[in-house]
C-alpha cells in the first residue's frame, strides 16, 4: 500500500482474520520512505510527500487505534556535522540546505519529526522517533547508490569499486539486525524524544572497500568520484542515550556484517542472471 493514500484496513481481505476494526493496532512502525541515494533524483516528489502526507496518514491511524507510533527518521536531519568530527547528540542542530537535491528527504524528515511531536502534543499520542544512521546487511537493493551493496557486487564481479568521495571520506555502519533490535527496544520503552540508532565506529570508505575485497577474494581496484550531488558528509552518532535508556548498542562487527552481506549476495546470484 502507498502510505500517501488513505486506507480502511477492515476492507483488506488479507487482514480480515485479524479483525482490525475490533482489535485495532497496538504498535505502528513507520519506515515508509525512499531512502536509497539514487531515489532522491528519481523520486523527489514522492519522497517529500511520503514525509508529509504519508506521515499524517500513519499518525491518523495511530490516533484512531490508540497505537504507539515509531517514526524512523535519519541522521540527515542533523545537517552539516561538526567540522571537528565530534559525534552528534540528539540536541545538535546543523545547517541544512532545504532547497538542494536531497531536500525532499533531509528537510522532509525534519518536517516528519515536527508532525510526530505536534500530534503527540495535540492528541496525546504515544510516539517515538528513531534517528537511523547508515545501516547495511543482506537483501539490500543493487544499483541504488548505496556503497556497501555496490562494493560487494563489483568485488564479486572483479570490477572496479567506485567510492563516492575521497580517500578520507568516512561513514559509520550499523548492521541491520542491530538496528532492528534498537527499534524494537525503543518501541518497548516509554521514550518520546528522538534517539540515535547507529554505530559509533567511523571508518573510511577506503577501509570498508578493502575489507570487501578481502572478504570476497576479489581482484577489484578502487577509484574515487564526486559525481553524486545528492551525497553529503554524514554525522557520526553519539549513542550514549540509547545505551543508557534502552540498554542498546551494536553487537555485530563490521567484518562479520560484511561477510554476511557478501555471502547472501553470492548465494542469490542465480536469481539475477538474465
PLM segments and residue spans:
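Short, contiguous clusters of charged residues that form electrostatic/catalytic patches at enzyme active sites
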Residues: 23, 53-56, 110, 114, ...
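C-terminal substrate-binding subdomain of Rossmann-fold SDR/epimerase-dehydratase oxidoreductases
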Residues: 155-274
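Generic recognition of short, well-ordered alpha-helical segments
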Residues: 10-13, 39-42, 53, 83, ...
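Generic anion/oxyanion-binding catalytic loop in active/binding sites
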Residues: 17, 29, 36, 44, ...
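Residues that form or immediately flank small-molecule/cofactor binding pockets and catalytic motifs
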Residues: 3, 8, 93, 137, ...
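NAD(P)-dependent short-chain dehydrogenase/reductase
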Residues: 82-91, 104, 114-171, 176-187, ...
